[in-house]
From Swiss-Prot:
The lineage of its organism: Eukaryota, Metazoa, Chordata, Craniata, Vertebrata. Gene3D superfamilies: 2.60.120.970, Cystine-knot cytokines. This is Growth/differentiation factor 8. Belongs to the TGF-beta family. The record marks R98, D99 as: Cleavage. CDD domains: TGF_beta_GDF8. The gene is MSTN. Acts specifically as a negative regulator of skeletal muscle growth. Homodimer; disulfide-linked. Interacts with WFIKKN2, leading to inhibit its activity. Interacts with FSTL3. Residues 1-18 form the signal peptide. One of its GO terms (cellular component) is extracellular space. The keyword Cell inner membrane does not apply. Residues 19-266 form a propeptide. GO terms for biological process: myoblast migration involved in skeletal muscle regeneration; negative regulation of myoblast proliferation; negative regulation of satellite cell differentiation; negative regulation of skeletal muscle satellite cell proliferation; positive regulation of lamellipodium assembly; positive regulation of macrophage chemotaxis; skeletal muscle fiber development.
C-alpha cells in the first residue's frame, strides 16, 4: 500500500513538471504559426498589389485604344499645352477621385472610355490651300468616335495679342471652301466686335457647333478655317502662327459630347488597411502614381486611389452567388472555390494627350475598386 502511494505521488509530480512545459511549447508553436500566417498574408498582398498596378497600366492603354504609351516629352507638353481658360479650369478644378459610395458597378460599366471633352489642336491639312497668298490658319482633324456621340458644345478659342491703346477689334471666322467660279474661297462663320484695353492679351471663344456638325456629316467639306482679328489700324491681333515666347497660345477647339449615365445596384464589403490582420476578402488601399511610370502624357490626375482586393474566400463568406454554397455542399470535390474580386468599381476622369497630340478629357470606366467580395 505504501509503495502504491509513493508511485502515485511520483506520477503526479511528473505531471506537474511536464504540464507547464507542454503548454509553453504549444503556445510558442501557435505563436509561430500565427506569425508565419501573417507573413504569408503580407507577401500575398504585396504580390497582389504589384499585379494590380501592372494590370492598371495595361487597362488604361487598352481602354484608351492606345497600343503603346504616347511618347511625349515634358518640353513638348509645355509647348503644346494651351494656356487657355477651359484647360486651366479642368486642371484647377479637377475632380480628384474620391473614396465615396457613388453608384457604378463592374457589370454595368462599358469597357472603353467615354469621351466628355476633347481639346483639338490645329494640324497641317492634306490639301495645302492658299488664301490671299498666305497659308490658311487652322485645320482640325477629329477622331472617328466623335461621330457616334451627340455634340453638345463646340467652341473655337483664339488668343488676341495685347494692345497699347484702347481699340475696337473686329473678329472674323471664315470657313475655307473649294474655289468657286468667281474665285471665292471662303464663307463667313461668325463675326463679332469687341473692345480691348491696354494690358495683357485675352482669350476669346466663338461658337462653332453648327460648322463642326456639318464637318462631321460631310468630312470632305472640312478644308479648314481662317481667323482674322483686326484692330482700328488694320493690325491682326490673332495668334495663328505663334511667335517666339507665344507657346501655348495656338487656336484650338473645345468639343463636348454627351455621356450617358448608368444606374447600378449597391454592394457591401470589408475595408482594411495595410496593417490589418483580417484574413477574409477585403479592400486594401493602393495609390497609382503615373509620374513614377514616366507617363508624362497624362496631364491629370498625376496619381489616383485605385485600391485592390485580397484575402481568403471560404464558402461561408460567399456573398454574390449564395447558390454556389449549396452546390459546394452537394459536391465539395467538384466545385471550384470562390475568389476575392471587385464587386463594385467606379470610373476616373482623365486629361491626357493621345497619339496625335490631341488633348482629351475623358472618363475611363472600372478603374477604382469600391467594393470587394467573394464570387
Amino acid at each position: 500500500m505504501q509503495k502504491l502511494q509513493i508511485s502515485v505521488y511520483i506520477y503526479l509530480f511528473v505531471l506537474i513538471l511536464a504540464g507547464p512545459v507542454d503548454l509553453n511549447e504549444n503556445s510558442e508553436q501557435k505563436e509561430n504559426v500565427e506569425k508565419e500566417g501573417l507573413c504569408n498574408a503580407c507577401t500575398w498582398r504585396q504580390n497582389t498589389k504589384s499585379s494590380r498596378i501592372e494590370a492598371i497600366k495595361i487597362q488604361i492603354l487598352s481602354k484608351l485604344r492606345l497600343e503603346t504609351a504616347p511618347n511625349i516629352s515634358k518640353d513638348a507638353i509645355r509647348q503644346l499645352l494651351p494656356k487657355a481658360p477651359p484647360l486651366r479650369e479642368l486642371i484647377d478644378q479637377y475632380d480628384v477621385q474620391r473614396d465615396d459610395s457613388s453608384d457604378g458597378s463592374l457589370e454595368d460599366d462599358d469597357y472603353h472610355a467615354t469621351t466628355e471633352t476633347i481639346i483639338t489642336m490645329p494640324t497641317e491639312s492634306d490639301l495645302l490651300m492658299q488664301v490671299e497668298g498666305k497659308p490658311k490658319c487652322c485645320f482640325f482633324k477629329f477622331s472617328s468616335k466623335i461621330q457616334y456621340n451627340k455634340v453638345v458644345k463646340a467652341q473655337l478659342w483664339i488668343y488676341l495679342r495685347p494692345v497699347k491703346t484702347p481699340t475696337t477689334v473686329f473678329v472674323q471666322i471664315l470657313r475655307l471652301i473649294k474655289p468657286m467660279k468667281d474665285g471665292t474661297r471662303y464663307t463667313g462663320i461668325r463675326s463679332l466686335k469687341l473692345d480691348m484695353n491696354p494690358g495683357a492679351g485675352i482669350w476669346q471663344s466663338i461658337d462653332v457647333k453648327t460648322v463642326l456638325q456639318n464637318w462631321l456629316k460631310q468630312p470632305e467639306s472640312n478644308l479648314g478655317i481662317e481667323i482674322k482679328a483686326l484692330d482700328e489700324n488694320g493690325h491682326d491681333l490673332a495668334v495663328t502662327f505663334p511667335r517666339p515666347g507665344e507657346d501655348g497660345l495656338n487656336p484650338f477647339l473645345e468639343v463636348k459630347v454627351t455621356d450617358t449615365p448608368k444606374r447600378s445596384r449597391r454592394d457591401f464589403g470589408l475595408d482594411c488597411d495595410e496593417h490589418s490582420t483580417e484574413s477574409r476578402c477585403c479592400r486594401y488601399p493602393l495609390t497609382v502614381d503615373f509620374e513614377a511610370f514616366g507617363w508624362d502624357w497624362i496631364i491629370a490626375p498625376k496619381r489616383y486611389k485605385a485600391n485592390y482586393c485580397s484575402g481568403e474566400c471560404e464558402f461561408v463568406f460567399l456573398q454574390k452567388y449564395p447558390h454556389t454554397h449549396l452546390v459546394h455542399q452537394a459536391n465539395p470535390r467538384g466545385s471550384a472555390g470562390p475568389c476575392c474580386t471587385p464587386t463594385k468599381m467606379s470610373p476616373i476622369n482623365m486629361l491626357y494627350f493621345n497619339g496625335k497630340e490631341q488633348i482629351i478629357y475623358g472618363k475611363i470606366p472600372a478603374m477604382v475598386v469600391d467594393r470587394c467580395g467573394c464570387s
